[in-house]
Amino acid sequence: KNLKSLFISLNSIAEKYKLPIVVSTHPRTKNRIEKMEEKIKPNKLIKFLKPQGFFDYINLQQFSKCVISDSGTITEESSILKFPAIMIRQAHERPEGMDKGTLIMSGLEKERILESLEVVIKQYEDEIVPQIVDDYNVDNVSSKVVKIILSYTEYVNRTVWKKDFSIKSN
């Protein structure tokens, strides 16, 4: 049912905007799509591609008219990288992104996605880009991560992995 709703929505987007639509497609999903293609014919503008590498995917996001995703990290990505986005989930775990207006949570219904697309695209065309979420705008993250890892490595090795680090005398 969800895949069918997504197909209907993507076809409507392709018809309305006349732009290529790139869908990062996992192999299992690709198999399901191939079984459905006869029933719901995808618009020729829709391209089902294998999952991209990290940097290629980020590049796709940054140069997209809008990113439509069910990813759990789309809120952070959209906020930090400042690209328009719509989350097609019914719920999420990042309320701070919603509070800042980083993206729109639409669900899978065609009308809601089309309505959300209009709003998000207009905002970015008018250069009304949401501010980065404060929680995501932290300085020196890599330095902090290194310190945390160094601080807890021995503890985790000892308590979780049961490695013995005691010094043995001769």
Task: Kindly give the residue locations of the regions a language model identified.
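Nucleotide-activated sugar donor-binding and catalytic core shared by glycosyltransferases
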Residues: 1-19, 24, 29-170
